[in-house]
Amino acid sequence: MQRPVCLLIWLFLLEAQAFEIPINGNSEFAEYSDLVELAPDKLPFVQENGRHQRSLPEESGEETDTVDPVTLYSYKVQSTITSRVATTTIQSKLVNNSPLPQSVVFDVQIPKGAFISNFTMTVNGMTFTSSIKEKTVGRALYSQARAKGKTAGWVRSRTLDMENFNTEVNIPPGAKVQFELHYQEVKWRKLGSYEHKIHLQPGKLAKHLEVNVWIIEPQGMRFLHVPDTFEGHFQGVPVISKGQQKAHVSFKPTVAQQRKCPNCTETAVNGELVVMYDVNREEKAGELEVFNGYFVHFFAPENLDPIPKNILFVIDVSGSMWGIKMKQTVEAMKTILDDLRTDDQFSVVDFNHNVRTWRNDLVSATKTQIADAKRYIEKIQPSGGTNINEALLRAIFILNEASNMGLLNPDSVSLIILVSDGDPTVGELKLSKIQKNVKQSIQDNISLFSLGIGFDVDYDFLKRLSNENRGIAQRIYGNQDTSSQLKKFYNQVSTPLLRNVQFNYPQASVTDVTQNNFHNYFGGSEIVVAGKFDPSKLTEVQSIITATSANTELVLETLSQMDDLEEFLSKDKHADPDFTKKLWAYLTINQLLAERSLAPTAAIKRKITKTILQMSLDHHIVTPLTAMVIENDAGDERMLADSPPQDHSCCSGALYYGTKVASGPIPSWANPSPTPMSAMLAVGAKPLESTPPTHLNQVENDPHFIIYLPKSKRNICFNIDSEPGKILSLVSDPESGIVVNGQLIGAKRAENGKLSTYFGKLGFYFQKEGMKIEISTETITLSSGSSTSRLSWSDTAHLGNSRVLISVKKEKSVTLTLNKELFFSVLLHRVWRKHPVNVDFLGIYAPPIDKFSPRVHGLLGQFMQEPAIHIFNERPGKEPGKPEASMEVKGHKLTVTRGLQKDYRTDIVFGTDVPCWFVHNSGKGFIDGHYKDYFVPQLYSFLKRP
């Protein structure tokens, strides 16, 4: 199963031919004389003639090193991250202070998946610049240079976690050389944070060593952390400054600080500088950033309950897994099994030339079952060959059978995680046939993730296998760290929060959208979608996201203005104004490369190839189809920078490989029927303006009720004068299983000896649907069984199921629809945050319809069955413009006053005046009993009637 090690090493060897650069004047570098005695390392600036001698008397026979032949004058790295798009420049300057020519290698490591965009080199005054060519054209230019006897170099990078960019030049005595490499990448969110790594390996002490990382995130930064990756040697050297939306990390060790020890001539700068951060997320619909004709959509919702998962672990136990690989895999699996949730189902399939199962069916992740599975795994003894085909088909069969028999939770997700270290040696050996078998057998609701351990496995095959079946592949290095790598990957997929996530951009002027349909969304990660739009036709971009959470269908809407970012970006010189364009190109090219590897016909593959090539040339980046030609102005010195072998997966580091689907409008189920505006029962209070008013009017702040009586076509009003914390029953219908209650909150302080109260929280309980909905001034929470979904008022969203629909209008209202015929509207009233008295509060509107049972009651519910009223003897009141009258209702004769109340459904700030007859003394005589009879103990309690 394993290939010869020598072959593996040979594949990673870097070819190089050194430039012979003629001398062209003396070095112009200043202040490097004090570096002459600094000892060199061998990487990344290796001198082939790095040792020279001084003459001694023949009898002594001694040879000694004198000075460092090549001095590293400066080593600078600059990274700017604008909305996850990172652009990095690595620059180094060296001086040959030797009397002999010196060969210098520029060898730096860049992140896997990054696109090289530019490389320049200045050698003794001669400048080499780069251009992007189609790969065959670039190689032809390189071959021509060699054929004509001109100097040519070959630069190749190797496919490891960090790829190497390598070139070599031969510089004459006294000459200077400067290298500068530019690359760009996208930061992918993993386990709740973004991680930016800069590999620092100057190889020797540098007169000037400086690293700067600027981060600009319009969403604002939630945290920023620079972990110690140099074993405490540079403690306190990184300087961090963080604002709300911007941050700067600098790393500038002095020459003394760079030394491994006080008298050492070796540098301690050899490793990775890591910056970790995350951004704020206020909206579940994500952050839609629009700029310069492109948009990017970042989607990472939180506060959602995990979706139960059905998971099959398929583990290679062939002979090649013997030793550290198997030991580390067992340790990882024991931890992973412990992390399963009680509502998960699982089983284990292990295979060599035979296929075995711990359980033939999925079982619940109870403590007993987990303990038994761990004992089974601990007893595994690797041996034999590798039958990947049958192992995968067995796992698929178990999941398919459970689904067909109705044994799976319909709201769950199904995952297969394959762990293998080699190609098949038993059973079906043809990789394309295995790929076809899996594709034909697997159901659309199953995602396949592949983990390839070491380099013996055909990683390209695993990528195609997973990408085609709604998953991804990842390489795991077979060493002492294998266990933590396996656990880290599992943690990334262990918490599915959404299924069937689709991004829709319904406007006709939105084009070239990247993959917008994803099978799952996992907690701690982020989905990114990008596209183009025509600025001359659109002033804003609309998005509609549909998805399924643990207990409900979900629709999220957002709208972004074109000029939202322009002013923000213009104020920061480090912000990249092309970040939207770069991110769109990065996603598009990577997704096209993955599609190209799966293309079913040669014609489709040629079409995709043409698109990738043109985009690579347009955006000046090195991809598997292009090469970078590096030459001087005269064209008589030339190198070729080639890309690594083609990576058939999408977006290195990304957790998702999706598909493209046509965008559509809001689903029909998420469009509630219009609520009659005239026939509503209302509870609310008059708000203050959202901004500081120039003058304040005296208003009634206690909850006021407006009861519309359709038969008599009259509005009757009353107030409830109670205390904060009390919960009032608004609607209680035990027969229909419907509860609506409201909890009172108080003002910040009393005025004129009276503390005003408001509704700060509303509870809706639909008993037959098993659904509870809590609406506060901060969040909207939907609970169904053990699952909970939360939205904030900053979202525009729809969520629900076949019977209950919740529609949230950003910072305005929530509409609840039951069985498409019963409606409740909740309005949010925001007040000026610094107001000394008032607070945010809620108003509720309910239609007086006959959809409730005769037993319905509550302060609103009792009027669903209209009482007979008779208003007569209208007369002047005690206050001008407020006449009084007598009202007979429910056997009582009351004195009522004509006045105006506010309906805020059409005007949330000022409201619409509604004329009504006001009943005094907290509605006494108009409501049944006393208002204190309507107190209930809990937010979802039914009203107990005497």
From Swiss-Prot:
Q: Where in the cell is it found?
A: Secreted
The residue range of the signal peptide is: 1-18
What's a Gene Ontology MF term here? Answer: serine-type endopeptidase inhibitor activity
Q: How is this chain modified after translation?
A: Heavy chains are linked to bikunin via chondroitin 4-sulfate esterified to the alpha-carboxyl of the C-terminal aspartate after propeptide cleavage.
Q: By its UniProt entry, which CDD domains does this protein fall under?
A: vWA_interalpha_trypsin_inhibitor
This protein's GO cellular component annotations are: collagen-containing extracellular matrix; extracellular region
What tissue expression does the UniProt record report for this protein?
Answer: Expressed in both liver and brain.
The task this protein performs is described as: May act as a carrier of hyaluronan in serum or as a binding protein between hyaluronan and other matrix protein, including those on cell surfaces in tissues to regulate the localization, synthesis and degradation of hyaluronan which are essential to cells undergoing biological processes.
Output this protein's name: Inter-alpha-trypsin inhibitor heavy chain H2
